[in-house]
Swiss-Prot record:
InterPro entries: RNaseH-like_sf (IPR012337), RNaseH_sf (IPR036397), X-over_junc_endoDNase_Mg_BS (IPR020563), X-over_junc_endoDNase_RuvC (IPR002176). The gene is ruvC. Homodimer which binds Holliday junction (HJ) DNA. The HJ becomes 2-fold symmetrical on binding to RuvC with unstacked arms; it has a different conformation from HJ DNA in complex with RuvA. In the full resolvosome a probable DNA-RuvA(4)-RuvB(12)-RuvC(2) complex forms which resolves the HJ. Belongs to the RuvC family. It is found in: Cytoplasm. It comes from Prochlorococcus marinus (strain MIT 9211). Mg(2+) 2 binds at E67. The active site is at D7, E67, D139. Keywords: Cytoplasm, DNA damage, DNA recombination, DNA repair, DNA-binding, Endonuclease, Hydrolase, Magnesium, Metal-binding, Nuclease. It comes from the Bacteria. This is Crossover junction endodeoxyribonuclease RuvC. Pfam families: RuvC. PROSITE patterns: RUVC.
């Protein structure tokens, strides 16, 4: 099963793809979708949609896992939530089932602690996927952690 993890953002959307079965998991790809600061928000949303469509067509994920937010205070946060909506819409258009996890659940799933910091999450991703170095940038590492959370949840369900 191929799982696509997404760490949403307007300037950068982290993505991580893992291939897994009940006993094994490996990283296929990870990186970021970087949008142009010179573009308006609408054009940036189009960039996210275009690049996410490319990833879906290339890898054909069976499940997508997206970070869920519980705060809506600043204008920056609103833009991130809007970008997250574009991600959800694009996945839905391709009929990719979507799992959503809050940050604390992601940290708990990959490190054993819901209060883990970025370095601890990154080290857990390295260990769990048997990587030689941390995925960069942090958004890509976070996206792999989000994909791993879906993997663990699916193993429990099955």
């Amino acid at each position: 099963m191929i799982i696509l993890g997404i760490d949403p953002g307007l300037a950068r959307v982290g993505y991580g793809l893992i291939d897994c079965n009940m006993t094994q998991k490996k990283m296929l790809d990870c990186g970021i979708i970087k949008t142009s600061q010179d573009h308006n928000d609408g054009e940036r949303m189009v960039e996210i949609t275009r690049d996410l469509r490319y990833l879906i067509n290339k890898w054909k994920p069976q499940i997508a896992s997206v970070e869920k937010f519980f705060f809506y205070r600043s204008s920056t946060t609103i833009k991130v939530v809007q970008a997250r909506g574009v991600v959800i819409m694009t996945l839905a258009r391709f009929r990719v089932p979507i799992l959503e996890f809050p940050p604390m659940q992601i940290k708990l799933a990959v490190t054993g602690s819901g209060k883990a910091n970025k370095d601890e999450v990154s080290m857990a991703v390295i260990r769990e996927l048997d990587l030689s170095k941390p995925p960069r940038p942090d958004d890509a590492s976070d996206a792999l952690a989000i994909a791993l959370t879906a993997y663990y949840q699916q193993r429990i369900v099955k």
